[in-house]
Amino acid sequence: MARYRHSRSRSRSRYRRRRRRRSRYRSRRRRYRGRRRRRSRRGRRRGYSRRRYSRRRRRRY
């Protein structure tokens, strides 16, 4: 039973890593919604900085 259990956990971790690379932006959005109350300063700074800077750069150039 121990060997079967270990092999199963390894396969799951590999699948999760592959899935995270594809849906990285979506997973981050959901995390910020849930962690807004706990980390309000960090979450707001990161979200606003990335969105605003991207819009400004596109308009300038």
UniProtKB/Swiss-Prot annotation:
<keyword id="KW-0158">Chromosome</keyword>
<dbReference type="GO" id="GO:0003677">
    <property type="term" value="F:DNA binding"/>
</dbReference>
<comment type="function">
    <text>Protamines substitute for histones in the chromatin of sperm during the haploid phase of spermatogenesis. They compact sperm DNA into a highly condensed, stable and inactive complex.</text>
</comment>
<keyword id="KW-0238">DNA-binding</keyword>
<dbReference type="InterPro" id="IPR000221">
    <property type="entry name" value="Protamine_P1"/>
</dbReference>
<keyword id="KW-0217">Developmental protein</keyword>
<keyword id="KW-0221">Differentiation</keyword>
<dbReference type="GO" id="GO:0005634">
    <property type="term" value="C:nucleus"/>
</dbReference>
<keyword id="KW-0744">Spermatogenesis</keyword>
<dbReference type="GO" id="GO:0000786">
    <property type="term" value="C:nucleosome"/>
</dbReference>
<keyword id="KW-0544">Nucleosome core</keyword>
<keyword id="KW-0226">DNA condensation</keyword>
<comment type="similarity">
    <text>Belongs to the protamine P1 family.</text>
</comment>
<dbReference type="GO" id="GO:0035092">
    <property type="term" value="P:sperm DNA condensation"/>
</dbReference>
<feature type="region of interest" description="Disordered">
    <location>
        <begin position="1"/>
        <end position="61"/>
    </location>
</feature>
<protein>
    <recommendedName>
        <fullName>Sperm protamine P1</fullName>
    </recommendedName>
</protein>
<dbReference type="GO" id="GO:0030261">
    <property type="term" value="P:chromosome condensation"/>
</dbReference>
<keyword id="KW-0539">Nucleus</keyword>
